[in-house]
Amino acid sequence: GRAQGARPRDPAELAAAWSARLDAAARDAPVLVPYVDAVRAVYDAVAGLPEPILAHRVHGDLHLGQLLRTTHGWLILDFEGEPSAPLHERRRPDSPMRDVAGMLRSFDYAAFFQLLSSDPRAFADDRTATSPLLWHAKEWTARNRDAFCDGYAVRAGVDPRRHGPVLRAFELDKAVYEVVYETRSRPGWVPIPLSSIKRLTAGATSGSSAG
């Protein structure tokens, strides 16, 4: 059944919001400029979807840091939404794929943060094809992304990977935000979200693919 308060959202409306954020992000983080057209193409694909996107109240800032494991199971914390977003946007119904994308991005960070900490040049072009640590990080990420999507499908009755274009667009929107954040706060970490943007705009066909 539908989640409480669910309502349809226009895909073109979502895509327009993503594009506006992309333009602003490219101004703040010029490293994004070479990817703007490819990212916008993903957004445009969502804008052209024939059916509305089901939306309801979501967490809005879901990632591994918002989870707490207890003896009674997992708890989800902090339902205030994205800290940088205005309050009216945090309260607005949104696609649950936003929260799924947040978790998938979090798996990337969990793997590649460790890699980058041990090898600052891990993402250098001359290293990506031969680095065993990078290969293991990608494999770990792919395995955990798939496990999360499998579990989500069992509990929610909807496999996020069946919403590939929408999920990929939400992942890109999150990664674009991360590039700006890292540019301002931790420049050495910019390769983490930037590598995901490269993957997500290079013909990935599955929301769970880690490339």
State what each model feature region is.
Residues 113-123:
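Short acidic alpha-helical/loop segments enriched in Asp/Glu that coordinate divalent cations
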Residues 105-108:
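A conserved short helix in the protein kinase C-lobe
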Residues 111-114, 183:
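Long alpha-helical scaffolds in large eukaryotic adaptor/regulatory proteins
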Residues 63:
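Acidic, metal-ion-coordinating active-site neighborhood of RNase H-like domains
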Residues 1-60, 70-76, 82-93, 97, ...:
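ATP-dependent phospho-/nucleotidyl transfer catalytic cores
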